[in-house]
């Protein structure tokens, strides 16, 4: 009967869930053992050395240059029109682009015919990580953080790093923070006629936002970090354990940049059972078109992994993951600009310079960034005059695409931004 079938199915799913949970715990424990971590690090280093000797690395570099041009000129412009919130490219610096999402035309500081001032939309700059693409915040109309914030009356801009080629491998964090982001924020301030802009950083993008806010506090209205690692010594997620053990210079010597395929392999390896059974478990039950579209869109985003610029990856791993300099106020960003000879040794990123209001959003079930690492930021920003913390029952990506997040979290976050603007 149908009731018996439903009961059997329920028993099966519960058993399957239990087995997968136990298997994950076993693999997670084994993958953290010092012997395995060393083996993984040595294997990647040896593979990279072999690729360098045999010419595979050089072949990858040549192919990567072609792929970068194809992606930047054709794939990405087409991709940004599929199910996305309408947007315009308003600023471009080399491969970096600044986008502005369409909203009802309201000019800042204008007045209506009856003399009442039009309420201006506070400008917000979304800063994404170097891993994958920023469109996870605008994946589909039903689960779009961008649309959610636009509906609340915010003026949303987004930073897009583009697809780097191998000849970009020497770009540094300074290029991204003190040049690309700084010029973008100056542009936003000019076109919106405001003095300060709210920064909205997700994952590593939150770390870039922290760096910028510490170096240029006079241009930042509010600082919002989402699932952002703060105290890297507290980040005991599996990927962080592996990252600290990696001999990244071997990879960069062979491939120039950090290949996206290696990043994807690491993401899949940390949960091998779930990875191997993912599609079977999803399609074993009938699904409606909406859930299928959301699943496939998420999978597309997961594997849309551009390379990470070599020097930026080296700096981020060395300064943050291995030495934990950011939260210690000891991270130095080298000044690579041609017109600034007074800062030969660069500038120290001092989080005590962050005095503006700060909102920290944490995913309680985050297995990519330890919640304790993110939470430490509220203690580290000692001079912020207004600090808020939202802990949401979700995973890392669930913050962006979870239905409950769009009903509960983002209205609250949007309200916080408006109240502090």
Q: Predicted segment positions?
A:
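Low-complexity, highly charged intrinsically disordered N-terminal segments
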Residues: 31-113
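Short beta-strand/loop motif that positions the catalytic acidic residue
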Residues: 354, 360-362, 366
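Alpha/beta-hydrolase active-site loop
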Residues: 170-191
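Alpha/beta-hydrolase-fold enzymes
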Residues: 1-55, 190, 194, 200, ...
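Short, surface-exposed "cap/lid" segments of acyl-processing enzymes
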Residues: 85-165
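Catalytic histidine-centered segment of alpha/beta-hydrolase-like enzymes
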Residues: 368, 393-408
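Conserved alpha/beta-hydrolase "acid-adjacent" motif
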Residues: 367-373
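Catalytic histidine neighborhood in serine/cysteine hydrolases
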Residues: 317, 374, 379-397
């Amino acid at each position: 009967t149908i009731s018996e079938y439903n009961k059997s199915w329920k028993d099966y799913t519960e058993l399957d869930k239990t087995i997968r949970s136990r298997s994950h715990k076993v693999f997670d424990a084994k993958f953290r053992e010092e012997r395995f971590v060393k083996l993984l690090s040595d294997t990647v280093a040896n593979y990279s050395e072999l690729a360098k000797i045999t010419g595979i690395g050089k072949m990858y570099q040549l192919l990567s240059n072609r792929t970068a041009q194809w992606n930047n000129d054709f794939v990405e412009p087409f991709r940004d029109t599929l199910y996305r919130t309408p947007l315009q490219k308003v600023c471009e610096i080399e491969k970096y682009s600044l986008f502005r999402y369409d909203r009802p035309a309201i000019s800042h500081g204008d007045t209506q015919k009856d003399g009442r001032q039009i309420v201006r939309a506070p400008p917000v700059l979304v800063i994404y990580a170097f891993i994958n693409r920023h469109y996870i915040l605008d994946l589909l109309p039903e689960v779009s953080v961008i649309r959610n914030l636009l509906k609340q009356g915010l003026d949303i801009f987004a930073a897009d790093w583009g697809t780097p080629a191998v000849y970009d491998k020497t770009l540094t964090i300074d290029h991204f923070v003190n040049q690309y982001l700084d010029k973008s924020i100056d542009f936003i301030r000019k076109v919106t006629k405001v003095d300060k802009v709210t920064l909205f950083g997700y994952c590593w993008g939150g770390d870039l936002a922290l760096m910028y806010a510490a170096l240029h506090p006079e241009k930042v209205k509010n600082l919002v970090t989402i699932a952002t690692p703060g105290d890297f010594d507290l980040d005991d997620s599996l990927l962080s354990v592996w990252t600290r053990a990696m001999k990244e210079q071997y990879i960069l010597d062979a491939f120039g940049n950090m290949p996206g395929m290696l990043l994807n392999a690491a993401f899949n390896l940390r949960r091998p059972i779930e990875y191997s059974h993912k599609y079977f478990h999803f399609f074993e039950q009938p699904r409606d078109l909406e859930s299928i579209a959301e699943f496939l869109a998420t999978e597309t985003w997961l594997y849309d992994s551009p390379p990470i610029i070599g020097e930026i990856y080296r700096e981020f791993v060395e300064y943050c993951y291995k030495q934990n300099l950011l939260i210690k106020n000891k991270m130095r960003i080298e000044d690579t600009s041609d017109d600034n000879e007074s800062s030969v040794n660069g500038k120290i990123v001092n989080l005590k310079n962050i005095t503006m209001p700060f909102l920290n959003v944490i995913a309680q079930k985050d297995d990519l960034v330890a919640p304790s690492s993110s939470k430490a930021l509220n203690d580290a920003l000692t001079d912020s005059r207004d600090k808020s913390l939202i802990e949401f029952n979700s995973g890392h990506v669930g913050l962006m695409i979870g239905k409950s997040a769009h009903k509960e979290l983002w209205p609250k976050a949007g309200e916080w931004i408006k109240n502090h603007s």
